[in-house]
Amino acid sequence: MESKSSSSSLPLFALFNFFLISFCRWVSSTRIFLSRFVPLLQHHQRVFDKKNNKDQQETLTKQEDDDDDDDDDDDDDDDDIDISREEAEMVMRSLGLFYNDDQLQEQYSAKEVSSLFEEKEASLEEVKQAFDVFDENKDGFIDAIELQRVLTILGFKQGSYLDNCLVMIRSLDGNKDGKIDFNEFVKFMETSFY
């Protein structure tokens, strides 16, 4: 009888594993997607600077305009273009990311922004942030309802059924309390990704 219940929870564990991996890949793709905004923000800064120097632009000859266009192509590799605090706030708000005012610098160089999106091993703090995405009521546990909420938000139909979520929780629940605590979550993350 036990082998039957463990074999029926195996596909659900695999499903949960798939959902979690998909979620992490989504986060990674979002980071990569956002890294593509750096050139856009650089271009925006150039356009803004050009508008402020309108008088100077009017005095340029056609030859100088062509040279400037060529120089703009060369400037793509330069790190001298900054992103303002307001631009960083706008991007973070549009992504639904929250921040404290003291966490943001007045300006960021293109190199600093680019380094935010480099691939690196997840730190314990990043794993905690991922755990907090699931732990809506902040009680230190992920229960089936919280898991269901996240999987539904991510668009997984199987996650919309509470019974499926209960089976997923049971498959990871080492102490059999019906919830996943942070240590169980870390253990799952270590076995899934490392």
Curated annotation (Swiss-Prot):
<dbReference type="InterPro" id="IPR002048">
    <property type="entry name" value="EF_hand_dom"/>
</dbReference>
<dbReference type="GO" id="GO:0005509">
    <property type="term" value="F:calcium ion binding"/>
</dbReference>
<dbReference type="InterPro" id="IPR039647">
    <property type="entry name" value="EF_hand_pair_protein_CML-like"/>
</dbReference>
<feature type="binding site">
    <location>
        <position position="175"/>
    </location>
    <ligand>
        <name>Ca(2+) 2</name>
    </ligand>
</feature>
<feature type="domain" description="EF-hand 3">
    <location>
        <begin position="160"/>
        <end position="194"/>
    </location>
</feature>
<feature type="binding site">
    <location>
        <position position="139"/>
    </location>
    <ligand>
        <name>Ca(2+) 1</name>
    </ligand>
</feature>
<dbReference type="InterPro" id="IPR011992">
    <property type="entry name" value="EF-hand-dom_pair"/>
</dbReference>
<feature type="domain" description="EF-hand 2">
    <location>
        <begin position="122"/>
        <end position="157"/>
    </location>
</feature>
<dbReference type="Pfam" id="PF13499">
    <property type="entry name" value="EF-hand_7"/>
</dbReference>
<feature type="domain" description="EF-hand 1">
    <location>
        <begin position="76"/>
        <end position="98"/>
    </location>
</feature>
<keyword id="KW-0106">Calcium</keyword>
<dbReference type="InterPro" id="IPR018247">
    <property type="entry name" value="EF_Hand_1_Ca_BS"/>
</dbReference>
<feature type="binding site">
    <location>
        <position position="177"/>
    </location>
    <ligand>
        <name>Ca(2+) 2</name>
    </ligand>
</feature>
<feature type="binding site">
    <location>
        <position position="137"/>
    </location>
    <ligand>
        <name>Ca(2+) 1</name>
    </ligand>
</feature>
<feature type="binding site">
    <location>
        <position position="146"/>
    </location>
    <ligand>
        <name>Ca(2+) 1</name>
    </ligand>
</feature>
<comment type="function">
    <text>Potential calcium sensor.</text>
</comment>
<feature type="binding site">
    <location>
        <position position="135"/>
    </location>
    <ligand>
        <name>Ca(2+) 1</name>
    </ligand>
</feature>
<feature type="compositionally biased region" description="Acidic residues">
    <location>
        <begin position="64"/>
        <end position="81"/>
    </location>
</feature>
<feature type="binding site">
    <location>
        <position position="184"/>
    </location>
    <ligand>
        <name>Ca(2+) 2</name>
    </ligand>
</feature>
<keyword id="KW-0479">Metal-binding</keyword>
<dbReference type="InterPro" id="IPR001751">
    <property type="entry name" value="S100/CaBP7/8-like_CS"/>
</dbReference>
<feature type="binding site">
    <location>
        <position position="179"/>
    </location>
    <ligand>
        <name>Ca(2+) 2</name>
    </ligand>
</feature>
<feature type="region of interest" description="Disordered">
    <location>
        <begin position="52"/>
        <end position="81"/>
    </location>
</feature>
<keyword id="KW-0677">Repeat</keyword>
<feature type="compositionally biased region" description="Basic and acidic residues">
    <location>
        <begin position="52"/>
        <end position="63"/>
    </location>
</feature>
<protein>
    <recommendedName>
        <fullName>Probable calcium-binding protein CML45</fullName>
    </recommendedName>
</protein>
<feature type="binding site">
    <location>
        <position position="173"/>
    </location>
    <ligand>
        <name>Ca(2+) 2</name>
    </ligand>
</feature>
